[in-house]
Design a protein with these regions (language model features):
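The conserved beta1-alpha1 loop
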Residues: 6-10
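Alpha/beta-hydrolase active-site loop signature
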Residues: 12, 40-44, 105
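The serine-hydrolase catalytic nucleophile loop
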Residues: 12-25
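Active-site loop/oxyanion-hole signature of alpha/beta-hydrolase fold enzymes
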Residues: 20, 30, 34-73
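Short beta-strand immediately N-terminal to the catalytic nucleophile in serine-hydrolase-like folds
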Residues: 74-76, 101
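Gly/Ala-rich beta-loop-alpha elbow adjacent to hydrolase catalytic centers
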Residues: 76-84
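Flexible "cap/lid" loop of the alpha/beta hydrolase fold
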Residues: 85-90, 95-126
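Hydrophobic, aromatic-rich cap/lid helix
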Residues: 137-151
Length: 151
């Protein structure tokens, strides 16, 4: 029997938006895999605290979703991929196969200016000319999130 597949979305999204509405979850289930979906704190159906301290350990919420009876195969995108990478380092016995997508150079080199630009966009403080920064607020709102909880 194959290990369950844990699917973790990226920043501003949700399990529903990234994995269910795109058909990925259904394809895995059709292939006989059990799917475990998790919404990261501040996203989708997860609690959305406004206290930054609550977000210190996103990986703990993912660990709480894992079954007790063996490892999972895991797929993560962007923030979900970074969270799974941390999970694999902390508890390698809990992870079988690991697919990490959408992280690029961010895994090794944080783009502080880019992060501040996104935060300004989400808070509505970016210059009107910075369409990309403003798009981040719209993107975060589309998944039913509380954008203020995400920054």
């Amino acid at each position: 029997m194959s290990a369950p597949v844990l699917l973790v979305h990226g920043w501003g999204s949700s399990f529903q938006r990234t994995w269910v509405s795109t058909g990925v979850s259904a394809l895995l289930e059709d292939a006989g895999r059990t799917v475990i979906g998790v919404d990261l704190l501040g996203h989708g159906r997860a609690p959305k605290p406004h206290d930054p301290e609550a977000y210190r350990d996103l990986t703990a919420r993912v660990v709480d979703a894992l079954p007790d009876d063996g490892p999972v195969d895991a797929v993560g995108f962007s923030l979900g991929a970074l969270t799974l990478l941390e999970l694999a380092c902390r508890a390698p016995e809990r992870v079988g196969r690991l697919v990490l997508a959408g992280i690029g150079a961010n895994v090794l080199d944080r783009d502080a200016a880019g992060i501040q630009r996104i935060v300004a966009g989400v808070r509505g403080l970016a210059p009107e000319s910075d369409v990309q920064a403003h798009a981040f607020r719209h993107y975060a709102e589309q998944a039913g999130n509380d954008p203020d909880a995400l920054v």
